[in-house]
């Protein structure tokens, strides 16, 4: 199965669909993102924008989810920033806290005090 993310004009993922692998094959039988995009447009309209994503492989850093941002410069889907103090890891395109989370129990992030608090 192949997964494609619909991207709106603000580069936000609005939905993710699953199509058959055969719907992504070019005339030579090779997988082609362009063929998959054309198939999605045939289903949802020619004015829609699609980018392939993968649940099993991180071809675009992260699997696309509704609300994620598509960044073509990074060739990545970026999840929403969970807190203003968290920064983007450029390698993984995941958000990281200002201080690493403790590993000795259950904690939650306290944004007002920018620290981890034990549950």
Name the predicted role of every residue range.
Residues 1-119:
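Interaction-interface detector
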